[in-house]
Amino acid sequence: MSPTALVRARPRWARLMGGFFALMLPPAVCAHAIVVESVPVHDARLETSPPRILLRFNTKIEHGLCRVGLEGPDGDIETPLDPPEAPERLQARVPPLVPGTYVLRYRTFSPDGHVTEGVLRFHVGK
């Protein structure tokens, strides 16, 4: 192989090896935090107010950087986060809610630094 061919081959080889190692990374290293379970579920129609809201993600989240906000018929509702029970879960206490439609907005950070924002709607009452 000529010296010129070696110079051309190295970058291709390096790219192939880089791609190979990227594929070998565990999914959690590359994953954005995606909600895999919520209580209540999106668009739920509840007869009574839920005592708390739960969001479970597909990966660990940085609890200290996460936020949730609940908006109802009478405006914003304080929803303090509970201490973490598991690295992939967020729980927030909810005061008794009056009948109406509620919107939960959340913002999480995963260990890879990616931000995930989302909205969950539910209805309380008939």
Tell me the role of every PLM-derived stretch.
Residues S2-F20:
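Bacterial N-terminal signal peptides that target proteins for export
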Residues P26-A28:
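N-terminal signal peptide c-region/cleavage motif recognized by signal peptidases
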Residues S38, L46-T48, R52-R56, G113-K126:
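Extended, polar beta-sheet/loop recognition surfaces of beta-rich domains
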Residues I53-E78:
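Short, surface-exposed alpha-helix to beta-strand junction/turn motifs within ectodomains of secreted
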Residues L81-A86:
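Short beta-strand segments within Ig-like beta-sandwich modules, predominantly Fibronectin type-III
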Residues E88-A92:
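Short strand-edge motifs at loop-to-beta-strand transitions and within beta-strands
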Residues R93, V98-R107:
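A glycine-anchored, Pro-Gly-centered beta-turn/N-cap motif
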